[in-house]
């Protein structure tokens, strides 16, 4: 049990920062940070961390902003990606997507839900935790990173290039203030068909690459019942998501066509086996092949960290110490709390899926609003989440000590 006097002091301390926390969120939402351009947003976060007395503030090689606080042996990292998707068609927004609006206690703005909404609570929570002695035994990091275009790349690069490997991670993707403990993985493929171009008036002289892919697309659309299933993570999924065509003109037979396939995988589904599944659909032929995509785009700093687009599934049981600690912190502060999972993918694919680091998710917001013109977060939850981020380290330490 947590001493009631400590809880009262924590709540009073967070309430005293309410206006600062909300203003901080509105300011970082007002700074565009799509297409990995996070520098300006990161600089604003760095200013806030400096004001709060973080011990170290630095940029990693990829261009992610990092703040360190505390000097204990255990390494705890709070992960919040601060890049966002674009706004799409501006005419679909009924308000400025960056300035946003507050209505009935909810902030509507690009990135409010996904996922700048977790940054203020993390940044303030760690500072308050140290001030109150709730961070004793830890070196804690806030990691404001790029995730939208290749989830898991930023943490992978951070660990490899900076040499900092957390013992525990909290992911700030929206969880509705619940404790999330996993999600499905995915693999991204492309299928390339080669044909022969000809003038559309003499199409019989050509070999249409688009037509070659049509039966493959049809077969892919029917294979989902054959895919794996898991009691917690759910059913595997497969979707043809995009198509590109190479053709001399719109009056010519295309000589190349490419489709992209998003394959959501659960436990027991291996990337190589899924590649073979697609190759079996294609059959033995020289003019069509499937391959796993490679991500090798440079970040805004010019940093390149090539990775195959393989994202492992991950999940922890409810009796895992970090899950128990997350639940205990939430129940202490808010009452009964559930565990859950994300439907989409997060940086957990590296932290837990590849590196095996105990990880959970906790944040305000509901993922159904991510990437939409209704991107939103309840401001009360943003403020109250600060209490959780401050209390969690000490609850985790007590849980680990039994």
Predicted regions and their residues:
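Acidic-glycine-rich active-site phosphate/pyrophosphate-binding loop
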Residues: 89-103, 181-192, 328
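A generic beta-sheet turn/junction motif
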Residues: 69-71, 80, 184, 195, ...
